[in-house]
Amino acid sequence: KVATQTRDTNDAKISPKASVTISPKTGLKDRYVVKYTWKSRGFVWWNCTWYVAQNKTVTWRGNANTWIRNAKAAWEKTGSTPVVGAIVQFSWEWYNRYYGHVGIVAGIENGNIIVKDMNYRWLYEVTIRKVPINSSTIDGYIYVD
C-alpha cells in the first residue's frame, strides 16, 4: 500500500526509515507529491502510534493510553525519567481523552523534553515541540531502540 500526501517542500519532514518517492506535481513548480511506503505495522495509518512504530521497535499493540502497560507486559523497560530516544506517553490535556497520545523524546533542554510526534495539532502533521518535564500530562516513558 502506498499513501500519498501533498505538502510544500519546506514542510516535508521524512523519517530516515521511510522509502520515499518525490516527484514534481504538474503545473506547480513549488509543490511536490510525496509518496510514503511505510508499513502499517499493525497500527492505523497516520496516527501517533503508527508514527512512533515507524521509528522505534514496538512489539506491543493498543491505543496510545495503554502503551506503558502493554510495553511492561512485553517485558520492555518503562519509567518516569525522560531519556533521548524514549517513547513518551501522554494523557489528557490537548490529547484525545479516549485514545491518549504518544511521541518520541528527541531532546532534553532547560526543563523541557523536545517531543517529535504526529497528529498533535493537525491530522497527518509531524510536529517537534517542547513539553515541560514536570507536565501532568506525561504518564511515563518506554525505553526501546
Feature-to-residue mapping (PLM):
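Aromatic- and glycine-rich peptidoglycan recognition patches
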Residues: 108-145
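Compositionally biased, intrinsically disordered low-complexity regions enriched in proline and serine
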Residues: 6, 33, 52, 142-144
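N-terminal secretion targeting segments of exported proteins
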Residues: 1-19, 144-145
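Secreted/periplasmic proteins that engage bacterial cell-wall peptidoglycan
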Residues: 15-118
